C-alpha cells in the first residue's frame, strides 16, 4: 500500500479493526489477538523493503531517499492507528538497514548490529515515532482490546487508489483529548481533499 501496491484499500480498512470485520480467512475473537507490524527480525527491515520496492536496481540502503522516508512514516502511521497490539523491529524508528538481506540470522554481527549513528542522521524519523507512541497512549478507541472494539471504527471509505478514511469513537471512562478521530491514509502521490462524514453516515 505505502510503496504503490494496488487494490489494497479494502485490506487496509480490515486491518484497522484488527481483521475483526472479516477480510481474511480467519476472524479473531478480538483485536487483542492481532499483532500489527511492518518488519521483524527474520525478514527485511522496513527501510530495506521500501528501498528495494521503490528503487529496485539502483538500491542504495544508506542513501536518504525522500520517497522511502515518506513511505516509512506512512507505514508507521498506519499500524499505529490500527486496533490490536503493536510490534516494532529494533531500529525501525531510525531506518535500520541490513543492506537488503532478508534473512540475516546467519549473517555477520557487522550486518546485524544496530547502527546508532542513524538515530542522529534520521533524528526526525525518531521523533516521529516518539510522537506516534505518545499519541497512541491518548487513543482508547485504538487501544481497546475488547471483543466489541471494532464497533468503534465506523464510516470506512475508499476515496480512490491509495486513499482511505475512517472515524474512530475515542470516548473512554476517563476524559479523552478527543471524543472522535477522523483518520485518512493517503498513499497516492497527490494531495487529497476528503470530507469528514457525519457519525453513522
Over which residues does each language-model region extend?
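A broad, low-specificity signal for short, low-complexity segments enriched in glycine/proline
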Residues: 1, 51, 127, 141-145, ...
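Conserved alpha/beta catalytic core and glycan-binding cleft of carbohydrate-active enzymes
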Residues: 1-90, 94, 103-105, 170-176, ...
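A broad, low-specificity signal marking well-ordered, structured residues that form hydrophobic/aromatic
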Residues: 35-37, 112, 164, 192
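Glycan-recognition and catalytic regions of carbohydrate-active enzymes
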Residues: 72, 81-101, 111-181
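Short, glycine/charged-enriched secondary-structure capping and boundary segments
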Residues: 102-105, 197-199
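Catalytic or ion-translocation cores adjacent to nucleophile or general acid/base/metal-coordination motifs
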Residues: 108
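Surface-exposed beta-strand/loop patches in extracellular or lumenal glycoproteins
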Residues: 187-200
Amino acid at each position: 500500500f505505502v510503496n504503490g501496491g494496488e487494490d489494497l484499500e479494502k485490506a487496509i480498512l480490515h486491518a484497522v479493526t484488527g481483521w475483526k470485520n472479516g477480510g481474511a480467512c480467519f476472524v479473531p475473537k478480538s483485536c487483542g489477538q492481532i499483532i500489527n507490524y511492518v518488519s521483524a527480525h527474520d525478514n527485511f527491515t522496513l527501510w530495506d523493503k521500501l528501498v528495494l520496492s521503490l528503487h529496485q536496481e539502483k538500491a542504495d540502503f544508506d542513501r536518504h531517499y525522500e520517497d522511502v522516508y515518506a513511505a516509512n512514516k506512512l507505514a508507521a502511521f498506519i499500524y499505529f492507528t490500527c486496533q490490536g497490539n503493536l510490534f516494532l523491529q529494533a531500529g525501525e524508528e531510525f531506518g535500520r538497514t541490513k543492506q537488503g538481506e532478508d534473512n540475516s540470522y546467519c549473517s555477520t554481527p557487522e550486518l546485524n548490529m544496530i547502527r546508532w549513528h542513524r538515530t542522529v542522521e534520521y533524528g526526525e524519523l525518531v521523533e516521529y515515532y516518539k510522537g506516534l507512541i505518545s499519541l497512541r497512549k491518548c487513543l482508547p478507541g485504538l487501544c481497546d482490546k475488547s471483543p466489541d472494539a471494532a464497533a468503534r471504527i465506523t464510516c470506512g471509505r475508499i476515496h480512490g487508489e491509495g486513499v482511505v478514511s475512517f472515524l474512530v469513537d475515542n470516548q473512554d471512562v476517563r476524559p479523552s483529548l478527543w471524543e472522535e478521530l477522523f483518520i485518512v491514509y493517503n498513499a497516492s502521490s497527490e494531495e487529497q481533499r476528503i470530507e469528514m462524514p457525519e457519525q453513522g453516515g
